[in-house]
Amino acid sequence: MTEQMQLLLLKELKVLDDARDILVYSFNKCSAIGIKENYEPEELESFESYTGRFARLSDILIQKIFRLVDELDLDTQGTIRDRINRAEKKELIASSDIFVEIRIVRNDIAHEYLPEAIRDIFGKVLSLTPHLLDGVERTKKYCSKYTNVV
């Protein structure tokens, strides 16, 4: 691995850490709010920030980090599904099916506008966040063989 690739990986892992930290903050805040029929405007704002942070972290992990790991491992590029399946084989994630669901929810976050559907998204994001965070930790551990950092 070139020094340039190692520096790029370290930079992307820092971005991943920062995004994880802010997602954890929002996860804790929104877990305390919980799922309910009606939200106060401040609660909606918290959940909207949370879902945006969830989508951002999933993009960083799947689109940037998994792609970079594939490049470092000399794997061929492919579809997002291919990338997720390879991540499961490398044990970066526990389940490719869960990460496909994370990707679907990420797309729903970007394109859903109906209030009743948004509440459903809130529940899904709350249940999927621990899996996303686990994927981050597994990936960082895997990447330590390239960076000598955990």
Label for each model-derived stretch:
Residues 1-150:
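Solvent-exposed interaction patches of small proteins and small membrane subunits
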